[in-house]
């Protein structure tokens, strides 16, 4: 069991401006609560046409979590996974993964995604706790209004204004981690944050924020064998399996295995590999900062410029595990807004610094010590010597490995560190491990509320018209390993990949504004693809201002990210190639599915070892097991969703109820599959070439699943205020993968627990100047699928508590 003990020291200077509350005590403040993310205009949260959740400043103040980012784990309908310390990924309604490209993360309406990944790098560009006004969460499709990568929803983090929240604030979080950790001593975790904001006049203001986080990540130490049956035909399992491939051991994967003839039988042999803890320093050191300037032309018009950046030293997970070192990401943003117009342009840029791929590092340290051909020859020699001396097969295999590994680089030695440093700078994963990516995108968008000023006469008819347009252009800079220019003779020249979209939203109020009808039509056009329509229709019925029923139906598309479209990565003998025709022409047409090749090779091996067939005879017998690839080039994903919901207040506004139900259908999931191409034009030779790993080219291709997938779920949240300031909250979320039609094995993992439950009890001023909260979280076990590993995630229960004491004379709070 891992324990986390924390002490948070929060200092807020006397310059901070307190916000006045005029809500009656002990009532749930929902009648006055306004949100903007659901419809891109200000509206009551009770009358939102789709599910929206809010984490308020009060929620953040009372959370028993370490930060507002951690507190989001308790939001109704939101799933949060933690691939590493300081790295959290949001998702809703299924199909979670560590680089979620279906769920957007915004700060003041600007997407903070990493350009080359298509999703946010954890909370790297998120505000610190001191600058958060509130967080709005859409746990469901938002494509009609936002496009982008929002088929599963979005989080919009809204920061404080320096006109209304001024002064200096400092926060220090300190924790002890790694209790009862056999891989590490107890470690110190610290996070230091500050915010300074000042209005220099009624027109000009600025703010500056920064945070420094330092800690030590938990060591990934799962050594479960991913290839336990490789030598089952020889009766070798467990520790005797010479093709061992541990989850967090790198250099012994499929591309580092070979079938060799030993003593008259064929054995699958893998190189030895290195454990993750030997390849990466798990020290976490993240720095982030932002600044924003504001100029008001008048009370209705304002121009602002923002800049935020982060540098990361952290562990990061995709299909492989990475060590991020000197990773740099930044955003410049310019925004103008008045009563009817909002326009913004922002640029996201990233550089991966000296980051590296842990798998490639492990396998290429091995190859720097000894080339594969030499190592396998030495293995044969060692095996033959051992058997000649009378050793049994398992012992002979062990002695053969020791002989072949003699002189191998040992972790912690100067020689090992030297070769690791050398490979860290080689940007080719066939011979090195460097991750050297520099990518950018430019996003420009504008929206106009036509009825606010230009067609204000429509207001009398209860009509509101909102229209918007946006463009995102990626500037892709080939690095020789991750990306190449597929259309230019110079494959290292920069190129672009863009998408343009626009929407019109019309809302009509009827029955004395008790009934609200809304229709949204969005059109998106991306390079390489035809235009796609994303419509949404919704209805909200409010018999009174405390009871609100809603229903909506919508569809959306997700276009491939630049990595899915244009990647060209040499990854340890397997080339990962983007799914556009300009990248992968000829591969889909000539490839065989790797799963069928594995079955074919296993059957041939069994017939050679157990049925006395020659290799040629065994290949001929089993060649029908080989399956030609039937996947093709990328097309956009499509999702259709129906949602109904209810928000209401009861017991004189003391009780708030929020519930929703949804049903979604997905088609054309963008996913990866492995396929190999035999290195021969002679069709008769293909089976023999596909039995020999050295005579085939291995690919991991981005393509679309042929499955049609249906999911449904619901959530229920309750908030009850009572007894002079007590607040009790509880919510539950149910998510279900209902059916997969035309199942082809290429579906993304659902990777979502069926049940999540959160509850809390809090009290402001439990005693004089003392706030207290206790929180509870439970989720059931679920099955996780990814290219790194598959397996069960155990159910877990968390109980968190906090007591905060305010020292009024020092304007200081100890939590």
Where are these regions (language model features)?
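Conserved C-terminal beta-signal and adjacent last beta-strands/turns
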Residues: 197-203, 209-215, 284, 328-332, ...
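Membrane-embedded beta-barrel scaffold of Gram-negative outer-membrane proteins
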Residues: 582-697
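Short, acidic, small-residue-rich periplasmic hinge/interaction motif at the N-terminus
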Residues: 20-59
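Extracytoplasmic beta-strand/coil segments of soluble accessory domains associated
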Residues: 44, 52, 69-114, 133-134
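Outer-membrane beta-barrel translocator/receptor signature
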Residues: 130-133, 139, 144-228, 285-289
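Surface-exposed extracellular loop regions of Gram-negative outer-membrane beta-barrel proteins
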Residues: 286-330, 466-479, 493-540, 718-734
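Gram-negative outer-membrane beta-barrel transporters
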Residues: 468-470, 509-511, 651, 656-786
């Amino acid at each position: 069991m891992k324990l986390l003990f924390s002490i948070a020291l929060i200092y807020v200077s006397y310059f901070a401006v307190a916000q006045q509350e005029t809500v009656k005590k002990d009532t749930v403040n929902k009648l006055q609560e306004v949100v903007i993310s659901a419809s891109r205009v200000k509206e009551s949260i009770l009358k939102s046409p789709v599910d929206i959740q809010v984490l308020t400043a009060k929620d953040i103040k009372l959370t028993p979590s370490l930060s507002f980012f951690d507190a989001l784990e308790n939001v109704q309908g939101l799933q949060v996974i933690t691939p590493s310390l300081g790295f959290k990924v949001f998702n809703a309604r299924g199909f979670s993964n560590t680089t979620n490209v279906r769920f957007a993360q915004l700060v003041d309406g600007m997407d903070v995604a990493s350009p080359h990944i298509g999703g946010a790098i954890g909370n790297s560009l998120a505000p610190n706790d001191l600058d958060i006004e509130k967080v709005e969460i859409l746990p469901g499709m938002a494509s009609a209004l936002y496009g982008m990568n929002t088929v599963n929803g979005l989080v919009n983090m809204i920061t404080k204004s320096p006109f209304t929240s001024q002064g200096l604030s400092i926060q220090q979080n300190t924790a002890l981690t790694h209790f009862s950790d056999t891989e590490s001593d107890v470690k110190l975790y610290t996070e230091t944050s500050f915010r300074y904001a000042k209005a220099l006049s009624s027109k000009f203001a600025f703010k500056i924020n920064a945070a420094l986080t330092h800690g030590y990540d938990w060591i990934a130490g799962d050594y479960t064998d991913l290839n336990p049956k490789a030598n089952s035909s020889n009766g070798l399992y467990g520790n005797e399996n010479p093709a061992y491939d541990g989850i967090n051991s790198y250099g012994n994967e499929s591309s580092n295995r070979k079938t060799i003839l030993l003593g008259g039988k064929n054995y699958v042999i893998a190189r030895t590999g290195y454990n993750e803890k030997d390849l990466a320093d798990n020290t976490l050191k993240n720095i982030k900062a932002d600044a924003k300037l504001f100029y008001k032309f008048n009370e209705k018009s304002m121009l602002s410029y923002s800049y935020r950046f982060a540098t990361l030293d952290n562990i990061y997970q995709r299909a492989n595990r990475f060590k991020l070192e000197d990773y740099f990401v930044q955003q410049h943003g310019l925004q103008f807004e008045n009563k009817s117009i909002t326009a913004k342009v922002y640029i996201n840029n990233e550089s991966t610094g000296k980051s590296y791929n842990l798998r490639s590092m492990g396998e290429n340290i091995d190859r720097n010590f000894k080339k594969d051909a030499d190592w396998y020859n030495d293995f044969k020699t060692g095996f033959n010597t051992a058997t000649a001396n009378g050793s049994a097969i398992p012992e002979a295999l062990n002695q053969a490995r020791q002989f072949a590994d003699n002189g191998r680089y040992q972790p912690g030695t100067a020689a090992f560190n030297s070769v690791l440093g050398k490979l860290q700078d080689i940007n080719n994963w066939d011979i090195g491990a460097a991750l050297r990516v520099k990518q950018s995108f430019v996003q420009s968008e504008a929206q106009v509320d036509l009825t606010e000023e230009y067609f204000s006469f429509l207001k009398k008819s209860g009509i509101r018209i909102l229209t918007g347009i946006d463009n995102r252009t990626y500037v892709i800079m080939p690095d020789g390993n991750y990306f190449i220019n597929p259309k230019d003779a110079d494959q290292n020249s920069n190129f672009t990949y863009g998408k343009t979209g626009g929407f019109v939203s019309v809302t009509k109020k009827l029955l004395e504004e008790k009934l609200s009808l809304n229709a949204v039509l969005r059109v998106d056009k991306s390079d390489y693809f035809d235009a796609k329509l994303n419509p949404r229709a919704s209805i909200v019925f409010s018999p009174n201002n405390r009871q609100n029923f809603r229903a909506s139906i919508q569809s959306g598309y997700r276009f491939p990210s630049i990595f899915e479209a244009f990647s060209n990565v040499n990854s340890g003998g397997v080339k990962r190639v983007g799914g556009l025709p300009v990248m992968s022409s000829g591969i889909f047409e000539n490839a065989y599915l790797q799963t069928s090749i594995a079955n074919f090779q296993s059957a041939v091996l069994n017939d050679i070892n157990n049925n006395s067939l020659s290799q040629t005879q065994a290949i001929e017998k089993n060649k029908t097991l080989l399956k030609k690839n039937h996947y093709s080039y990328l097309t956009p994903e499509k999702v259709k969703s129906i949602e109904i919901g209810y928000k209401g207040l009861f017991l004189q506004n003391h009780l708030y109820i929020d519930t929703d139900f949804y049903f979604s259908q997905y088609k054309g999931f963008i996913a990866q599959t492995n396929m190999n191409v035999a290195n021969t034009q002679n069709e008769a030779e293909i089976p023999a070439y596909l039995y020999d790993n050295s005579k085939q080219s291995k690919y991991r291709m981005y393509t679309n699943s042929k499955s049609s997938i249906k999911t449904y779920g619901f959530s229920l949240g309750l908030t009850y205020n009572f007894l002079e300031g007590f607040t009790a909250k509880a919510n539950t979320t149910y998510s279900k993968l209902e059916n997969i039609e035309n199942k082809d094995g290429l579906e993304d993992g659902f990777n979502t627990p069926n049940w999540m439950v959160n509850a809390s009890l809090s009290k402001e001023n439990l005693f004089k100047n003392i706030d207290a909260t206790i929180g509870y979280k439970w989720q059931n076990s679920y099955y996780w699928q990814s290219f790194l590993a598959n397996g069960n995630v155990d159910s877990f229960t968390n109980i968190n508590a906090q007591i905060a004491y305010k020292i009024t004379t020092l304007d200081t709070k100890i939590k």
